[in-house]
Amino acid sequence: MLDGFATPKGTKSCAQEHSPFYYGELNQSGLLVSQAGFGCYRVDATITEHREALRRALLAGVNLIDTSSNYADGGSEALVGAVFDDLASSDDISRESVVIVSKVGYLQGQNYQLSQERKRQGKPFKDLVLYADGLEHCIHPEFIDDQLTRSLERLKLDTLDFYLLHNPEYYLSWAGKTGVSLEEARREYYSRIERAFQHLETEVERGRIRFYGISSNTFPSPATDPEFTSLERVWEIAESLSPKHHFRLIQLPMNLFEPGGVTEANQSNGQSVLQFARDQKLGVLINRPLNAIIDNRLIRLAEIQAVRAASAEEISQLIDDLIHSEGLLKRKILPELSLTTSLQAQVLEQIAIGGVLQQQWSNFGSYERWYELQSYYFAPRIRGVVQFLEQQQSLTESVFPWIRSHQEILEAAFGAISSVYREQAAEQAARTKARVSSADADWAEAATLSQMALRALRSTQGITTVLVGMRQESYVDDVIEELGRPVNRQDRTESWRKLQGIHL
């Protein structure tokens, strides 16, 4: 376990070592942090690529890491612990130079199973939000105590720099679905936050954390939203506990398509959440800088190289070829194997994606949605069938030519569909770049759309660090390139307002 914590002296030394890399002060803590941080959503200790990307980022001068107990079911924190411990052991970085943030609230995977076991024992976590099958939420002090112990073990740390309540508004969502009045729900919501803050102050006293805060997706929401989290109300709670409280950091989503953090006047004095945070000298982390959610569609703010889009006729023919190949498996391959009727039916069900593609290929909405379906739904199904067939003892020689042929046909169909969505994404990226460039001359200096999205945020007064999911070393390099370019931090409210209602 690494002792110590991030210090003003240590982070200043990091900033000096990596000049002209750009850093800023994190609230009143005196800590200097890079204007882009390593966001650990969807990274895992078991993936070498993620390990190398985090290592590259830390050595390049990125000195803020944001993770959570539920990311990769604990694997994200384990990755941070392993990489940081390795670099610290070899004296490549020091504990004092890097700010580590983690979060608490979700019960998924292992935590969900822990919760079910406690229920069976008659000792359920208190104030548990039963949100959905496989998903619960909790910010009760008892749960926070349990989770902080586990997080510190995975991170291999004695002390965590910042510990955030992770989307506590899940309670408000649950309350709305179960008929609790909005007035009663909000009263209970802020009461739960107060109890959590009281406990977090004791964790500061114990030396297990230095500061605490909240990460909420609804900080930038309209005040009329039933799930809105009022920073002003949260600040009042912290102030009521002690004039020397340790509530020092918030996190919220913001990007070129979702500028509410700047433009939504949702505090009682007409300020935005970012303005209020700036006045109270709170640190502000921004998440989802490159992933916008518009009308339930995921839009990736990164440039995609366009290719010639295949025609509808070409795609239809390729999908017909795929359906024919699926039919060959049913008619010629499976009858030669010693499989039960039930197993044959399962194999056919798994591999039958041609019909779905024929009906739906043009309705997936965006390149990001199509890529997600292709990579995490369709392709794994096919791989599962191929692996199953290759393991059969009754395998005949005719199976191997079919496997090779089917994979080629599948790749051709996937490629043709991708070409359509890639063309759409490239056109959309060009329109977005033009709109953003006209909104602010400083933003126009960025080389790529992803760098433009980062530049817009890091140049906005009140934003401390932008969290970027740098899962590959190439993503790290893209961020480092942008952070090496000078840009003034200033009030850019008018620039952000020009982006409101930006069309896809």
Where are these regions (language model features)?
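N-terminal binding-site loop/beta-alpha segment at the start of enzyme catalytic domains
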Residues: 1-120, 126-130, 134, 142-145, ...
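Alpha-helical hinge/cap motifs
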Residues: 61, 156-157, 210-213
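Short beta-to-alpha linker loops that shape the active-site pocket of alpha/beta-hydrolase fold enzymes
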Residues: 68, 163, 168
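Fungal eukaryote-biased detector of long internal structured cores
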Residues: 137, 143-145, 150-153, 157-158, ...
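Short, exposed beta-strand "edge-strand" segments with a Pro/Gly-rich flavor and a Y/T-containing core
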Residues: 1, 45, 90, 132-139, ...
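Short, acidic/polar
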Residues: 45-58, 137-154, 227-239, 449-456
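Outer-envelope exported proteins of Gram-negative bacteria
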Residues: 99-101, 160-165, 211-217
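Beta/alpha (TIM)-barrel catalytic core signal, keyed to glycine-rich beta->alpha loops juxtaposed to Asp/Glu
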Residues: 4-13, 18, 73, 168-504
